[in-house]
Amino acid sequence: MWTAPVLLWVLGSVWFWDSAQGGAIGALEDDLVTPGPGDDMVNPGLEDRIETTDTTGELDKSTAKAPLVPTQPPIEELPTSGTSDHDHKEHESTTTVKAVTSHSTDKKTTHPNRDNAGGETQTTDKKDGLAVVTLVGIIIGVLLAIGFIGGIIIVVMRKISGRFSP
């Protein structure tokens, strides 16, 4: 009956499965560290065709290219008339990384299943629930699309074989 066409359709789509697995991934962009304008480093000898030497007056022997030369600090780092030199040095030496979190950093949070004696509350991230709903919606949509396409294929096969009666 309809099992032979469906079996042929499944076997014919096997070659798609290998490409759906994905290929080998090389080095990710996040793992690469390259000096750039943000690092205050330039290589003027490459673009200008000017031979650049290091502090000893010789070319870099390992690459036979001009070494990276630090430039002046960007204009954002230069002190302005409104700030003192002391404030600038303090800002320059202090690096603070602020991360966006879903939990308050000022209050202690407790486990949601334990007694909450201090009256502290725990905040949760509403975006986690949104991600789960989105994932479930995508899965349901893909399953419905597969069923819809399968139904169209079955109707077309029946029409071709002459067993279609509306």
Swiss-Prot record:
Ranges annotated as biased composition (Basic and acidic residues): 54-63, 84-93, 104-114
GO cellular component: anchoring junction; apical plasma membrane; basolateral plasma membrane; cell projection; cytoplasmic vesicle; cytosol; external side of plasma membrane; filopodium
UniProt-recorded name of the protein: Podoplanin
Region (Requires for interaction with MSN and EZR): 158-159
Its biological purpose: Mediates effects on cell migration and adhesion through its different partners. During development plays a role in blood and lymphatic vessels separation by binding CLEC1B, triggering CLEC1B activation in platelets and leading to platelet activation and/or aggregation. Interaction with CD9, on the contrary, attenuates platelet aggregation and pulmonary metastasis induced by PDPN. Mediates effects on cell migration and adhesion through its different partners.
InterPro entries: Podoplanin_domain
The organism of origin for this protein: Rattus norvegicus (Rat)
Modification note: Extensively O-glycosylated. Contains sialic acid residues. O-glycosylation is necessary for platelet aggregation activity. Disialylated at Thr-52; sialic acid is critical for platelet-aggregating activity and for CLEC1B interaction. The N-terminus is blocked.
Membrane topology reported for the UniProt record: Single-pass type I membrane protein
Family in the record: Belongs to the podoplanin family.
Major subcellular location class: membrane
All ranges on the Cytoplasmic side of the membrane: 157-166
GO molecular function per UniProt: chemokine binding; protein-folding chaperone binding; signaling receptor binding
Subunit structure comment from the entry: Homodimer. Interacts with CLEC1B; the interaction is independent of CLEC1B glycosylation and activates CLEC1B; the interaction is dependent of sialic acid on O-glycans. Interacts with CD9; this interaction is homophilic and attenuates platelet aggregation and pulmonary metastasis induced by PDPN. Interacts with LGALS8; the interaction is glycosylation-dependent; may participate in connection of the lymphatic endothelium to the surrounding extracellular matrix. Interacts with HSPA9.
Region of interest called Disordered, as start-end residue ranges on this chain: 54-124
Residue intervals on the Extracellular side: 23-135
Gene: Pdpn
